[in-house]
């Protein structure tokens, strides 16, 4: 378990001190009592990514040093879980804003009275297909996809409903040379059409869903992103996106591109690259869309489930 506190001091790399790739404790600078840096306890999951963070109260404004320490841990572990956070909507929006402002959430109407919070929910008796059950990186079809996502557990079923994450740095590192040679230099074609176009999964024929999803022809637009790319903050190479929002590769016809996408998703979601996250009520989870794929799982029929979600805007380099 590592402990982090305070702002960056001498010997920093980025926003935290490192030795052997692991963040170390940082001595806090004098601050007011209200904004005094908190000491974070970070416990890695022991899986391919993910860590549990305690020693911080996210219902209070955070000191710059605490924010820097959380960001360093986020970049290192890719998924952070903060248990025991009885956050309201103001708290969730304030926390999100520390890490780059709000991303644009298309196709899903925000909760009443808020512009940046959407409800990820499912009623106990709902029969519509599970939302977001396939691997994806949130909104990868945008020109500037969000850097991260924050998800706050409000009503959590007693069974099921885990979220799985897959580390795409690890997936690239372990990829066989022959497969890697086939993807070098490829531009992936991203689109929301399979999900959010009027003919898509969440389109006109999607009935009985409690989430407020609004399909639109805007989902037919396409964007190109490198399939192998450097993380904009850490510089580490990884895979970005997967079949679903990726509908092909520029320069490859479907007879070649679609079988390659299928082969890749089998690789990208392998067990050894995964972290299986178990939810708790009042738990906030933040993850890095630039490093990961994720997907929802079911297993909680007969139970309500409600989480509030924000997205962190693409990193501006500051």
Task: Give the positions of each predicted feature.
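Extreme N-terminal basic, low-complexity initiation segments
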Residues: 1-7
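Non-heme Fe(II) oxygenase catalytic core, chiefly the N-lobe of the double-stranded beta-helix
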Residues: 25-284, 290-318
